[in-house]
Amino acid sequence: MSRTASYAGMTTPVKDKEGHGIPCLQPIDVVECTYQYFTKSQNKLSLRVGDLIYVLTKGSNGWWDGVLIRHSANNNNNSLILDRGWFPPSFTRSILNELHGVPEIGNELEIFQAGLNLKLELSSNPVILSLEDFLDCCRDIEFKEQLAWSPIPVHERKGCCELLYYNQDLDVYCRTLPYLPQNQVETVNDYSSFPAISKIAGKKMPITSSPDLFYLNDCDVVYWYDLTRLVCHYVNLTERDLLANEREKFLTSLDLLTAQITYVYMLFRNLRLVEDSFKKTLKKLIYTLSRFSINANIWFHSTPFEEREAIASQKDPERRSPLLQSILGTFQKFHFLLRLLHFLSNPNELTILPQLTPRFFKDSFNTISWNNPFLRKHLNQHMSHDLPRQMIKAVAGASGIVAENNDEIPASKQGTSCSSETSHHSPSAPFQRRRRGTIFSNVPGSSDESDTIWSKRKKPYPLNEETLSLVRARKEQLDAKLKQMIKSANEYLSNTANFSKMLNSEMNFKTYEEVSGTIPIIDILENLDLTIYLNLRELGDENRVFDEDVAIDDEDKEFLKHSLSSLSYILSDYFNMKQYFHDVVVKFIIVAQHLTLEDPFVFSPMQNDLPTGYYEPMKPSSLNLDNAKDKKNGSQNTDIQEEEDEYEPDPDSLILFHNLINQDSDFNDLKFFNLAHVFKKSCDDYFDVLKLSIEFVNRLILERENLLNYAARMMKNNITELLLRGEEGYGSYDGGETAEKSDTNAVYADSDTKDNDEWRDSQVKLPRYLQREYDSELIWGSNNRIKGGSKHALISYLTDNEKKDLFFNITFLITFRSIFTTTEFLSYLISQYNLDPPEDLCFEEYNEWVTKKLIPVKCRVVEIMTTFFKQYWFPGYDEPDLATLNLDYFAQVAIKENITGSVELLKEVNQKFKHGNMQEATAPMKTLDQQICQEHYWGTLYSTTESILAVDPVLFATQLTILEHEIYCEITIFDCLQKIWKNKYTKSYGASPGLNEFISFANKLTNFISYSIVKEADKSKRAKLLSHFIFIAEYCRKFNNFSSMTAIISALYSSPIYRLEKTWQAVIPQTRDLLQSLDKLMDPKKNFIDYRSELKSLHSAPCVPFFGVYLSDLTFTDSGNPDYLVLEHGLKGVHDEKKYINFNKRSRLVDILQEIIYFKKTHYDFTKDRTVIECISNSLENIPHIEKQYQLSLIIEPKPRKKVVPNSNSNNKSQEKSRDDQTDEGKTSTKKDRFSKFQLHKTKKKAPKVSK
């Protein structure tokens, strides 16, 4: 790459298309060659003495990128030869700074040259091109990337107003900001782009100390600049301590300096800077440091302290001791070699260093000793390997394997195995052999869960009372043994003469027996089912993209976000408790082993006095001159100070301790301690952590119930379904209650179901041509209901001429859309209408078949189709393909054949498909009262406290019941099916207007009640409002209006209202007890068992049920049961999972819909007050959401200290349950203090503890 250019030619600066100057191709330095350098490489420059090189980039690996300016061989032609390439800076010197009067670098080079006795013959008057000439020469050179921007200083001009940019590091003002290359970071971090380190297969690459790759300490040295500062810091510190005559500080500083030089040596090895110049300089550097260390130790040991003090205080260097001058001379040579090494390597100060210290890879270690399902779920969603992809690439590069794309990165040995035939990204065989032998043969899998026996449990323990009972039962078994051990320790403390090695061995054996009995508790803690919290975290992710069938509005997102923030600290404490459990058990075992030792300090020499990471390179900003020595023992002293007052002083130990100190001038600060004291303390901690585990399991169970309870009360069944998705046992439906329904509540009576067995027996006696063809493909349940069957069998049973199963027919017509499309269903019916006769029938048998089977089946088909169009047709069932069936022609054919009901069928078909008036025909008529209520929309609002309190609670509850029952009556079975099916079976359902209006009204009522309280500034009025709404809720219960009652309870237990401590104190206890009884009725424990019992006892009384229970039942039944039955033995030898429809699932859905429809039949006989109803309806609009209400709550009662609230509530029962557990299990105030010491980020190495 060269060209000839005119030496004197002047050009204008490079401009872009808009005419603006671009500061590209600007050299950052100009150097002159001082030594000859020849190379055959095309991308490197060959240098001769006197050549001028314009430096464009200073590489971090010791190679610079520059443009060489050389005179042409033809002297008659005033021209230059330009070449661009890499060159070693050690063969050049900088001349640009000398011309600008900055001699620092030149002076240092002169020192180097004088020390090496070099004689240079350089040009005395080098000619440097101007920027314009340089740009003119380089205009035609093609560069692969834009070069780094160099700041152009702005000279001070008076009276000039312009925008300037200041760079603090360079101390320069500029008019423009830098043009950063797009791959600037990669250029700094990528060592493979320079000649010294080539990215060749088999060439090992260093693993960079990237924050994205490792869990780094805040003070870790990451950049070359940090390492340079660190070494200089310890060099200065060592020299200062030597001259200050401080022996201990000097030894400490010298020790740390030696460690840093070791890291520098490791750095050069990792960067493959192994040329002779580097090796010789490193060897001289280490040799000089060792001489300095030996001479300094001789100086401190051979010279008395006073003499050293006098010599060190001399300011005149010539009057110092020859030995000290020799030591300082050796240290100055060490200085020189260190700077020389730096100039030889000439690194980029922003270069990221290789990883020099052991650190954990990110996403491969979760810093705890237990299973972390949150980390495992995160990894499974974001990567196909069970090891982080960046970790695999880094380890592969360090092993000499280069993967051009992610598909070539091998998975770890714990990944799922697949055959070579099915693998789409299978590496070559040599690569596979090399991978197994080099990288991952010793790399473990992700440590997101511990490799223990109990971590292999297949089914997790559910968060329920049964699991809590297991933990409590196991703890009670351990308590008896533990109390006996504590008793033995107390007896020993009371009489030390009873010391016996046999007794200690026995206690050691009991300890192991006790710990082995803890395994069931560890099993439960390790395998708790936290699926609901995992789903909550995923749903609360702001960047999550939901599927089309998941309907989550802004209100739901706010609820999920609020729930996640309120529960996160509980989960964090739970995992901290598990780590604390681990620490206590380990300490318990160690202390028990300690009992068997005759000398408790026998292992003390094995203990490292230095804290972890003492010799690791740390940023100098974390050190100062005062704590350089204290860093050595700071961690240990801190731990001793934390526990120095935990044991009672032992007089005998103190006397012996002081006597030994008086006899010895040197001691290690270790104190004597009583083994029984330590063992008793470990027993107490072990006893407390067992209580703590029960408490946290209980908290997780209660918080799960509270979360589901709130979602159920707000009728957010979609949120409930998403939260419980994937949980063990999710969706289990207990059909016992449905089967036990009273006959009074039964809507679809079926008197024939009792005779099903006799009827099936009678079918066997019929001739073969009259028997049903698909009867063998029907599956019957124990309650004489169809449990499942094939599509043909279900259609055949639906149109059976002898058996009319009314419940089956209604269930089929309501839920058919989950089995067939509309076109498919009607096609099956038409095919059933046109039955083909069996083969080999004689004339008499054929006539009997037509008379006894064909004609009755045709009548049944017409009857079913008429009933379907008349009572169960929904506009969303319409499909384009229905026109191909010619239903009107089918009805006309049935009329010609004189089939009963065919005329009515034709009428329904014409009404549904020709007149296009389907919605008006099926929509219920609105009552006159509803129309009047909608016409008079604008009315008085309950906008003030006085207006609300002025309404009698009985009147308010009465009119609220009338209004909500009318809305409830608008709910249809199609609204319910659409709510749970969404777009699962069809996308033409549309919204659920009736059900959505009912849910919206209940939620608006909740917001209205809570807002009415928080907007009132006066405490006494707020208390009156609380009592007023509690009385309204009680009357709603008397009127069987459980929907409004639940809405009021939810408002009073919402976070903005519940935290009003002073307001709740003003409510009389009797009123709070009343609220407690209402809340207990709606307790979600055992699937709202109290509420369901209350609802079942109503018989024929009018009622507005709480619809959240129905939504939960519908959701769990639909999502928790499969659409198809899986049989162990297929019928007729056929094993087809999708062949047998799970009709029992559809029957359960209809059972729930049956109860919903039942409560629509009986109406209230209350007198309607249109004014009150109108005011209630209008007051529910435009209410601020819960977040705004919470802000108002903080304003009226800021910073609550202690929650004094109603006696019980569902949203905050965890606190009351926690208080109950503390009463039952004893006070555990001290365990929380101990637990706080074992936070993950505060865990420290414990030193031996003694008594004073």
From Swiss-Prot:
* Cellular component GO terms, alphabetical: plasma membrane
Q: Which GO terms describe its biological process?
A: cell division; Ras protein signal transduction
For molecular function, the Gene Ontology terms on record are: guanyl-nucleotide exchange factor activity
Specify where the region named Disordered lies, as residue ranges.
409-454, 623-648, 1201-1252
Instruction: Please name the Pfam families in this protein's record.
Output: RasGEF (PF00617), RasGEF_N (PF00618)
Against PROSITE patterns, the record matches this protein to:
RASGEF (PS00720), RASGEF_CAT (PS50009), RASGEF_NTER (PS50212), SH3 (PS50002)
Question: What highest taxon heads this organism's lineage?
Answer: Eukaryota
Q: Which InterPro entries match?
A: Ras-like_GEF, Ras-like_Gua-exchang_fac_N, Ras_G-nucl-exch_fac_CS, Ras_GEF_dom_sf, RASGEF_cat_dom, RASGEF_cat_dom_sf, SH3-like_dom_sf, SH3_domain
UniProt cross-references to SUPFAM superfamilies, sorted A to Z = Ras GEF, SH3-domain
Q: Where is the composition biased (Basic and acidic residues)?
A: 1214-1236
Which residues lie in Low complexity bias regions?
Answer: 416-428
Q: Which residues form the Ras-GEF domain?
A: 952-1199
Q: Where is the N-terminal Ras-GEF domain?
A: 782-914
What keywords were assigned to this record? Cell cycle, Cell division, Guanine-nucleotide releasing factor, SH3 domain
Write out the biased-composition intervals (Basic residues).
Answer: 1239-1252
Q: What else is known?
A: Suppresses the CDC25-5 mutation in yeast (restores cAMP level) and has similar functions as CDC25.
The protein's job, in short, is: Promotes the exchange of Ras-bound GDP by GTP.
Q: Where is the SH3 domain?
A: 26-97
CDD domains cross-referenced by the UniProt entry: RasGEF, REM, SH3_Sdc25
Q: What is this protein called?
A: Guanine nucleotide exchange factor SDC25
The species this protein belongs to is Saccharomyces cerevisiae (strain Lalvin EC1118 / Prise de mousse)
Q: Does the keyword Cell cycle apply?
A: yes
